[in-house]
Swiss-Prot record:
One of its GO terms (cellular component) is cytosol. It comes from Glaesserella parasuis serovar 5 (strain SH0165) (Haemophilus parasuis). The lineage of its organism: Bacteria, Pseudomonadati, Pseudomonadota, Gammaproteobacteria, Pasteurellales. Keywords: DNA recombination, DNA-binding, Transcription, Transcription regulation, Translation regulation. GO terms for biological process: DNA recombination; regulation of DNA-templated transcription; regulation of translation. The gene is ihfB. Belongs to the bacterial histone-like protein family. This protein is one of the two subunits of integration host factor, a specific DNA-binding protein that functions in genetic recombination as well as in transcriptional and translational control. This is Integration host factor subunit beta. One of its GO terms (molecular function) is structural constituent of chromatin. CDD domains: IHF_B (cd13836). PROSITE patterns: HISTONE_LIKE. Pfam families: Bac_DNA_binding. NCBIfam families: hip, PRK00199.1.
Length: 93
């Protein structure tokens, strides 16, 4: 499901809400999540899951085109861990 499909589904489910208000709400929620991660914070949505940052050590990678070794710097990457309720609902599907 894309963001556009999510917005369309929400508008269909809640006809009293406008497309614009749903679109702005979804964008703001995503912006808050990204902003918190940018600040190094962990986000937890009970029953759904948590977003955090994982540290990746510097390493030597390989350019797949040339086979040349490339030094990759250390970095933080976003990580999502599904919550118990989400895992259970997916398992039943």
């Amino acid at each position: 499901m894309t963001k556009s499909e999510l917005i369309a589904n929400l508008v269909a489910q809640y006809p009293s809400l406008s497309v614009k208000s749903v679109d702005e709400s979804v964008k703001e929620i995503l912006e808050q999540i990204m902003g918190s991660l940018e600040q190094g914070e962990r986000i937890e949505v009970r029953g759904f899951g948590s977003f955090s940052l994982h540290y990746r050590q510097p390493r030597v990678g390989r350019n797949p085109k040339t086979g040349e070794s490339v030094k990759l710097d250390a970095k933080y990457v976003p990580h999502f861990k599904a919550g118990k309720e989400l895992k259970e609902r997916v398992d039943l599907a």
